[in-house]
């Protein structure tokens, strides 16, 4: 293994929310921690990316055969247009990438990685803290109308995301490729809420440390 190619979103990029409520790339992000431990990762993850954007990035990236290709999406794909929700809470709003399309694009990503003789590894999206995330997306919007769309149940946001995590697991099984269930790793932590930023969705630096440690246990470095 000469290199590990990583395509993903803000979680893989190492984004955290600071005390001023600004997003920044942390020097203690999970990938940076792994690179410091000798993991040869080429990180193409970008804050806000969906699987279609990641696939386009992959198509424009030169890769060498025989290396792992880590694919980490779902958090942005499932996200809603919260402006539209707050303006029209009485009609259905789908995710940025509808679930069936998400599955198909994941399978396409896996196939194109294999066509380049890479070893695809799918990663589940992180769980979120529904209450925090509801408060976060309600800022500057009509919180009552958003809550009406959620049928007075902010926890439904987490269940909506879970559908995309299940799709990642099922796609890995159907395609016969490796699965890294980061979602399960985080939920195993009894103090999970303390590992998530105030926006309810991004891991903080303590969370990134957990992800890095478990990833290195899961994929011990060779050589």
Where are these regions (language model features)?
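Serine-esterase "nucleophile elbow" of acetyl-processing enzymes
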Residues: 1-45, 59-65, 204
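Cell-envelope and extracellular/periplasmic
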Residues: 11, 45-49, 73-74, 83
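A short acidic, helix-capping loop that chelates divalent metal ions and anchors anionic groups
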Residues: 13-17, 52, 79-80, 131-132
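Short, flexible loop segments at the rims of nucleotide/cofactor-binding pockets, characterized by
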Residues: 20-22, 45-49, 98-99, 156-157
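Alpha-helical cap/lid subdomain in secreted, periplasmic
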Residues: 36, 59-223
